[in-house]
Amino acid sequence: MTELTATKEWKEYEKYMREAIRQAKKAYVLTEVPIGCVIVYEGKIIARGYNRRNTDKNTISHAEMNAIRKASKKLGDWRLEGCTMYVTLEPCQMCAGAIVQARVSRVVIGSMNPKAGCAGSVLNLLEMDQFNHQVEVVRGVLEEE
């Protein structure tokens, strides 16, 4: 156990990741790839999403995209500055791009995705200096769950 895993901040990461896992279970029930996501602003969950690509027959119905859409509507702004996204699986290139474009402040990831992950596995779009916005990334929260 590292120092970070024992901190109050890490416990908060686990709390919200558990809700993202609950969202992933909703996708699983629909026979979707079980990925879940929540977005937190000022200590409150403002949006939830889960993978619905097959159900919606829509390429962009990933958990992160669904949650970003709901969070933007809730805040009345496309900018999600000050928001933290909790997602059960490392975002793909589409979702990573949307996260950067939405100006999400932090992304907390459960498991990495060595096949298509764009927060450090295949690419790291979230922390690229070349973009006008970089996202703080925390990896490995409740990875075994």
Model regions and ranges:
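Zinc-dependent deaminase
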Residues: 1-30, 94-145
